[in-house]
């Protein structure tokens, strides 16, 4: 008699898996405390919490901009907790990182700023990026232009970065991250300094990339209305710990109060500012 039992289907490897992750800075500050978090490849996750809750430190650990003190951290199944040197650069190449401060080269054009992210693919990296970006191939320039098209600012390709509005600069930063061909997006307060309309455009852009390119997104936000509108999950942090992880429909006023504590006005103040 033949055995007709089928082998169990293998579950897809998560984009991020952190287990009991800790980050303690030299001054003794415990910024991340026993954090366990899994982000799957089909997820758009919003992380909320007051200033100092550990949101930025968590993202910086995931991108290995800082080294976790203890615990384990995996990116697409690879343990990156203790890697160093060239290995860190390889890992960062898989991660599209977007910051509140846009980190553009202000005197370069929009297209040149996007091309800067291609330098890791260019074996002739010598000297300053301001010189190098003018020596990219036609194919690379066309690819960078396509990234600008995806975020809706291709018409600004030849303007200097320092002539753009905040929302436009943030979309340049997103296009630059796209040009890395990342496997995941991490965004640290990407709309904190933007007006409500620009904030919505930036969040729509991230969601479009998530849906069309199937790239997982983990984004830190102060704006609770944006967090619930775009996130498929809401992760609440307080004092370095994850204290809630719920669907947006389950984020009640009581949970928000629990996340923000005595700083609850900070949460609702941000919400009112974007009303």
From Swiss-Prot:
Database matches in Gene3D superfamilies: P-loop containing nucleotide triphosphate hydrolases (3.40.50.300)
Sorted UniProt keywords: ATP-binding, Cell inner membrane, Cell membrane, Membrane, Nucleotide-binding, Phosphonate transport, Translocase, Transport
SMART domains: AAA
Ranges where the ABC transporter domain occurs: 16-264
GO-annotated cellular components: plasma membrane
Pfam families: ABC_tran (PF00005)
Protein name: Phosphonates import ATP-binding protein PhnC
Reaction it catalyzes: phosphonate(out) + ATP + H2O = phosphonate(in) + ADP + phosphate + H(+)
PANTHER family: AMINO ACID IMPORT ATP-BINDING PROTEIN (PTHR43166), PHOSPHONATES IMPORT ATP-BINDING PROTEIN PHNC (PTHR43166:SF6)
Function field: Part of the ABC transporter complex PhnCDE involved in phosphonates import. Responsible for energy coupling to the transport system.
Membrane topology classification: Peripheral membrane protein
Matching InterPro entries: AAA+_ATPase, ABC_transporter-like_ATP-bd, ABC_transporter-like_CS, ABC_transpr_PhnC, MetN_ABC_transporter-like, P-loop_NTPase
Metal-binding is among the record's keywords: no
Binding site for ATP: 49-56
Organism this protein belongs to: Oleidesulfovibrio alaskensis (strain ATCC BAA-1058 / DSM 17464 / G20) (Desulfovibrio alaskensis)
Principal location: membrane
Subcellular location: Cell inner membrane
Subunit structure comment from the entry: The complex is composed of two ATP-binding proteins (PhnC), two transmembrane proteins (PhnE) and a solute-binding protein (PhnD).
Keyword Transport: yes
Family membership: Belongs to the ABC transporter superfamily. Phosphonates importer (TC 3.A.1.9.1) family.
Stretches that traverse the bilayer: none
Domain of life assignment: Bacteria
Catalytic activity, EC: 7.3.2.2
GO molecular function: ABC-type phosphonate transporter activity; ATP binding; ATP hydrolysis activity
């Amino acid at each position: 008699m033949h055995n007709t039992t089928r082998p169990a289907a293998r579950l897809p490897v998560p984009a991020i898996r952190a287990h009991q992750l800790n980050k303690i800075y030299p001054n003794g500050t415990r910024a991340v405390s026993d954090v366990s978090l899994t982000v799957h490849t089909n997820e758009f996750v919003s992380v909320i919490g007051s200033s100092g809750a550990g949101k930025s430190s968590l993202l910086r650990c995931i991108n290995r901009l800082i080294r976790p003190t203890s615990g384990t951290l995996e990116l697409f199944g690879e343990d990156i907790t203790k890697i160093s040197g060239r290995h860190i650069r390889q890992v960062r190449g898989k991660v599209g990182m977007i910051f509140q401060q846009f980190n553009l080269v202000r005197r370069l054009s929009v297209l040149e700023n996007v091309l800067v992210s291609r330098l890791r693919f260019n074996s002739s990296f010598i000297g300053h990026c301001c010189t190098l970006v003018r020596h990219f191939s036609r194919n690379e320039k066309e690819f960078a232009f396509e990234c600008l098209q995806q975020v809706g600012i291709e018409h600004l390709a030849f303007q200097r970065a320092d002539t753009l509005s905040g929302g436009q600069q943030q979309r340049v930063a997103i296009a630059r991250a796209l040009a890395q061909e990342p496997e995941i997006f991490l965004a640290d307060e990407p709309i904190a300094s933007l007006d409500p309309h620009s904030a919505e455009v930036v969040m729509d852009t991230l969601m479009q990339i998530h849906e069309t390119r199937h790239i997982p997104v983990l984004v830190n936000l102060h704006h609770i209305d944006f967090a619930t509108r775009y996130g498929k999950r809401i992760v609440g942090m307080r004092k370095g710990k994850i204290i809630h992880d719920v669907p947006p429909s389950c984020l009640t006023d009581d949970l928000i109060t629990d996340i923000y504590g005595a700083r609850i006005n900070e949460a609702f103040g941000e919400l009112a500012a974007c009303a």
